[in-house]
Amino acid sequence: MLDSVTHSTFLPNASFCDPLMPWTDLFSNEDYYPAFEHQTACDSYWTSVHPEYWTKRHVWEWLQFCCDQYKLDANCISFCHFNISGLQLCSMTQEEFIEAAGICGEYLYFILQNIRSQGYSFFNDAEETKTGIKDYADSSCLKTSGIKSQDCHSRTSLQSSHLWEFVRDLLLSPEENCGILEWEDREQGIFRVVKSEALAKMWGQRKKNDRMTYEKLSRALRYYYKTGILERVDRRLVYKFGKNAHGWQEEKL
């Protein structure tokens, strides 16, 4: 579907386009400069415009930023699929992003949807943004592959690299918990943060970030609503493990 839409709608000069050409090669290939013939020197940078109003140049600036900021492999991203306007980009489905950019498509789709819903404040905390993006891709890969991850993390060392796993392991480690977290409904996976700043301090020490606050930590936790790792609970400081979280259930005999 994506190919047919791309070649018939997005690219009027598609016959000259190599579909395997990385988009980064565009700037060194004069054949493709006409795509930007209406671009002027005074055009604004992509962060000053809502994604639906991006020009083709804005789309490319955004791709360049994502590759630089999140270490994505630009060679995986096909130029032909992204020689489009912001409105066309926003209409692409997650499956089309994956078809156009492979595993990078997972990340790009997540970033774009967060920009559309949160604005550019999404990038205010690079550490939290990278955590959210990585966990989104991890959970998506888990879902699409159909492979259930094994609970191979140590419950006492709390060395988990993801925030939600850190919280899970802390709940399962009373000797480390010290009353910071407590179960409200163990069977349903519902828990409460009792000592919010203590939790933030412990996570900050884990990540070597002495500026960590609960406000930042809770923002990172909310990213997990999008991935199905956590579910929203309409009570302050209360969270629930979602369908894509694993390792928190009590073992049934």
UniProtKB/Swiss-Prot annotation:
Q: Name one GO biological process term.
A: negative regulation of cell differentiation involved in embryonic placenta development
Q: Does the keyword Heme apply?
A: no
Q: Where is the PNT domain?
A: 33-119
Q: Name one GO cellular component term.
A: nucleus
The source's superkingdom equals Eukaryota
Per the database entry, where does the chain bind DNA? 161-242
Q: Which SMART domains match?
A: ETS, SAM_PNT
- What's its job? Transcriptionally activator that may play a role in regulating the later stages of keratinocytes terminal differentiation. Binds to DNA sequences containing the consensus nucleotide core sequence GGA[AT]. Transcriptionally activates the TK promoter.
User: Domain note for this entry?
Assistant: The PNT domain acts as a transcriptional activator.
PANTHER family associated with the record: ETS, ETS-RELATED TRANSCRIPTION FACTOR ELF-5
Q: What is this protein called?
A: ETS-related transcription factor Elf-5
Q: Where does this protein come from, organism-wise?
A: Mus musculus (Mouse)
